[in-house]
Amino acid sequence: MLPQDKLDLILRRHEEISARLTENPDAATFVSLSRELAGLDEVAQAIRAYRDEMTEISGMEAMLADPATEPELLALAEEELQDARQRLGAFEQHLRIALLPKDADDEKSAILEIRAGTGGDEAALFAGDLFRMYQRYAEAKGWGVEILSVSEGTAGGYKEIVAEITGKGVFAKLKFESGTHRVQRVPDTETQGRIHTSAATVAVLPQAEEVDVEINEADLKIDTMRAQGAGGQHVNKTESAIRITHLPTGTVIFVQDERSQHKNRARAMSLLRSRIYDAKRQQLEAERAADRKAQVGSGDRSERIRTYNFPQGRLTDHRINLTLYKLDKVMTGEALDEVIDALITDYQAAQLAASEGA
């Protein structure tokens, strides 16, 4: 049975927040209430849909129990009642998922970091392929993509690329992409047709706002320098490149991609906030891991999560034993949702099983 008292409390809170937002609260309160309301919208809608269906079923059951109901209506009501009960089951399942504890960062934008791993030039090329896959996927979703930092590979692709992906719910969709991605294919430079294996690591961080992380300017060491090209030569005459070191954590951010020192500093600070926030998040996750029963993989970014086998056109996600023979569509971003949605569904199923067994 669903906890009706809890459902009542959620609806009352949803209505209370909606009312308070019409009273012109101060900016900080408005932001806080808006976030809370956004977190309750889905579950409030699910509760109302579930209860509306319950009301419909009660009405049909009363009609069937009424001896005055005309015979021709009885058959119609019985058929409609069966359909309504099926809909109710779907509404209840959706509501149970909506009631699961929410990741507070799910609605945030994200920082995407891709780094070439083992495999030399081929790893850098694969890192480039992965970035283009996520870029196309993001564009299809209507999200914004802005490159924050890039180090190009000698034969193409990227040794490292960091990008900001902005939009509602970006982190919820991409957070399970963190880990080691392995590729198996024949490089263009391979003359004997041998399959090579290389890898790239992906890290997806929730984008932190200033309200999420407080950074003391006294804790920062900021160096400016002239931006450098791939061969180490200076590419402009002004000291536009920025290196920020967060002394308490030792986190170092270097950004040189804009000609403006001001823009590079803003990008570096945004990335620094997200790195510090994510480090705290990872620490909390590690502390909870012993008690948490529902998890897709370990979340460890060194964990091999997926293999892309180009000769066979096969993608395998090792965490949920998912295999798709449509690698070309995954790499264009077209079929990536099939993988992501399967991971989310598996995670939610594990959460439901854990909550029901608690």
Curated annotation (Swiss-Prot):
GO terms for cellular component: cytoplasm. GO terms for molecular function: translation release factor activity, codon specific. The modification N5-methylglutamine is found at residue 233. Peptide chain release factor 1 directs the termination of translation in response to the peptide chain termination codons UAG and UAA. Belongs to the prokaryotic/mitochondrial release factor family. The lineage of its organism: Bacteria, Pseudomonadati, Pseudomonadota, Alphaproteobacteria, Hyphomicrobiales. SUPFAM superfamilies: Release factor. This is Peptide chain release factor 1. It comes from Beijerinckia indica subsp. indica (strain ATCC 9039 / DSM 1715 / NCIMB 8712). Methylated by PrmC. Methylation increases the termination efficiency of RF1. InterPro entries: PCRF, Pep_chain_release_fac_I, Pep_chain_release_fac_I_sf, Prokaryotic/Mito_RF, RF-1. Keywords: Cytoplasm, Methylation, Protein biosynthesis. It is found in: Cytoplasm. NCBIfam families: prfA (TIGR00019), PRK00591.1 (NF001859).
